[in-house]
Curated annotation (Swiss-Prot):
Changing Q435P: In NEDCASB; uncertain significance. It comes from the Eukaryota. It is found in: Mitochondrion; Mitochondrion matrix, Mitochondrion nucleoid; Mitochondrion inner membrane; Cytoplasm. NCBIfam families: PRK00011.1 (NF000586). The modification N6-acetyllysine is found at K103, K181, K196, K297, K356, K464, K469, K474. The modification Phosphoserine is found at S470. It comes from Homo sapiens (Human). It catalyses: (6R)-5,10-methylene-5,6,7,8-tetrahydrofolate + glycine + H2O = (6S)-5,6,7,8-tetrahydrofolate + L-serine. Its EC number is 2.1.2.1. This is Serine hydroxymethyltransferase, mitochondrial. Belongs to the SHMT family. Homotetramer; in the presence of bound pyridoxal 5'-phosphate. Homodimer; in the absence of bound pyridoxal 5'-phosphate. Pyridoxal 5'-phosphate binding mediates an important conformation change that is required for tetramerization. Interacts with ABRAXAS2; the interaction is direct. Identified in a complex with ABRAXAS2 and the other subunits of the BRISC complex, at least composed of the ABRAXAS2, BRCC3/BRCC36, BABAM2 and BABAM1/NBA1. Identified in a complex with ABRAXAS2 and IFNAR1. Interacts with KIRREL3. Residues 30-49 have a biased composition (Polar residues).
Length: 504
């Protein structure tokens, strides 16, 4: 019986990491000698990772090779530039700096003050924001802490919020809870009510959202998604917020790069607060940003007195000291690098290509008879509903993983199981960073379709998900088909360049 092995030792090594692997073998063969040498000399801190920890170095090589030979379709992933990675792996990791520029609790912060202020300026410039009307906090460690900081700043415990339901394409931090448990910290500390998609169109049901808001009276409504392929009507959501006197938070984590490039509408005209991650379509290091309105909010018609926004101090206090300690200065620097890149014509071209590639992928899937939630895409992703095909996202994800295509299972409207949801989420940003074009994505869909068909055949022969996964590895004919498909996928993928470092 032929077993379909996924172990690294069974994989041929090509391109990414070949020379380094040779060095690793030499290091392993001389491990005893190296250890003896290390014992005889003092630690300098200048030892390379490959010298001081060959085991970890090899794991990095394996991951680098996986990325080079695979097709990365997870919509929330991208490939960071070498320049940003250099900042991320710099001496800035050494500096602790609780507080804000000019108001630190530690000395020696004059340089990191400049770095943080530079990141703030670039963040405002990237989204064409007037610093008199908008401010930004660049210290959140990622998107989820950024959202929690906003809730902490604007709400009291048990205040009410509304966000898109997770099975309909929302995010955990927008208040998700199941029938039996409050899943997200947002739903634990606050009272949440989801809004949903129209089941017929797959679009956000703004009319129902408005009706629900009138009854629920939320203090905060979140305009943001994690698996929604269409544009958000921020103006409509602003109307709802004004009617019920709620704040509007736009979570643009998935689409911030597209917003910066001006290829899709911006939420800043309508939102009170905007949060984002920095590693998705923005293509930076993993971190978070919180933008907030400042300046004059309104003028009292009776007294003529200017009424200012009060977000700045509340948000800054929520980030530090309420929720975080010292900022990750290395990440802030790397984000600043990415924000500079986001202001270039080249980044706009990249973002336009992301949209073209996503649409090409959607069209190719539709041509092959696949059902897409909402029927297509206006942004960087598509959500495939596999239920009409007779398959689920968990089985499709596993088959594709075995042939070096990385995607993720995802709930579709009406799904009741997060373990075997009906959807498969596919994104264009990462492969577009590897210079894929429309025809390349049509080829990718060919590979996906072949994998799904294998999955359908195996599903007809197995019962439970675990049986399905076991059959993929142990059935000789299936293993051979998967191995053949994987070889073609990897040969195709390796022909494209990879951003970042060559070796890791």
């Amino acid at each position: 019986m032929l077993y379909f092995s996924l172990f690294w030792a069974a994989r041929p090594l090509q391109r990414c990491g070949q020379l380094v692997r040779m060095a690793i073998r030499a290091q392993h063969s001389n491990a005893a000698q190296t250890q003896t040498g290390e014992a005889n000399r003092g630690w300098t801190g200048q030892e390379s990772l490959s010298d001081s920890d060959p085991e970890m170095w090899e794991l990095l090589q394996r991951e680098k090779d996986r990325q080079c030979r695979g097709l990365e379709l997870i919509a929330s992933e991208n490939f960071c530039s070498r320049a940003a990675l250099e900042a991320l792996g710099s001496c800035l990791n050494n500096k602790y700096s609780e507080g804000y520029p000019g108001k630190r609790y530690y000395g020696g912060a004059e340089v990191v003050d400049e770095i943080e202020l530079l990141c703030q300026r670039r963040a405002l410039e990237a989204f064409d924001l007037d610093p008199a009307q908008w401010g930004v906090n660049v210290q959140p460690y990622s998107g989820s802490p950024a959202n929690l900081a906003v809730y902490t700043a604007l709400l009291q415990p048990h205040d009410r919020i509304m966000g898109l339901d997770l099975p309909d394409g929302g995010h955990l931090t927008h208040g998700y809870m199941s029938d039996v448990k409050r899943i997200s910290a947002t739903s634990i500390f606050f009272e949440s009510m989801p809004y949903k998609l129209n089941p017929k169109t797959g679009l956000i049901d703004y009319n129902q959202l408005a009706l629900t808001a009138r009854l629920f009276r939320p203090r905060l409504i979140i305009a943001g998604t994690s698996a929604y392929a269409r544009l958000i009507d921020y103006a409509r959501m602003r109307e709802v917020c004004d009617e019920v006197k709620a704040h509007l938070l736009a979570d643009m984590a998935h689409i911030s790069g597209l917003v910066a490039a001006k290829v899709i509408p911006s939420p800043f005209k309508h939102a009170d607060i905007v949060t984002t991650t920095t590693h998705k379509t923005l293509r930076g290091a993993r971190s978070g940003l919180i933008f907030y309105r400042k300046g004059v909010k309104a003028v009292d018609p009776k007294t003529g007195r200017e009424i200012p926004y009060t977000f700045e101090d509340r948000i800054n206090f929520a980030v530090f000291p309420s929720l975080q300690g010292g900022p990750h200065n290395h990440a802030i620097a790397a984000v600043a690098v990415a924000l500079k890149q986001a202001c270039t014509p080249m980044f706009r071209e990249y973002s336009l290509q992301v949209l073209k590639n996503a649409r090409a992928m959607a069209d190719a899937l539709l041509e092959r008879g696949y059902s897409l939630v909402s029927g297509g895409t206006d942004n960087h992703l598509v959500l495939v509903d596999l239920r009409p095909k007779g398959l689920d996202g968990a089985r499709a994800e596993r088959v594709l993983e075995l042939v070096s295509i990385t995607a993720n299972k995802n709930t579709c409207p009406g799904d009741r199981s997060a373990i075997t949801p009906g959807g498969l989420r596919l994104g264009a940003p990462a492969l577009t960073s590897r210079q894929f074009r429309e025809d390349d994505f049509r080829r990718v869909v060919d590979f996906i379709d072949e994998g799904v068909n294998i999955g359908l055949e195996v599903k007809s022969k197995t019962a439970k998900l675990q049986d399905f996964k076991s059959f993929l590895l142990k059935d000789s004919e299936t293993s051979q088909r998967l191995a053949n498909l994987r070889q073609r996928v990897e040969q195709f993928a390796r022909a494209f360049p990879m951003p970042g470092f060559d070796e890791h």
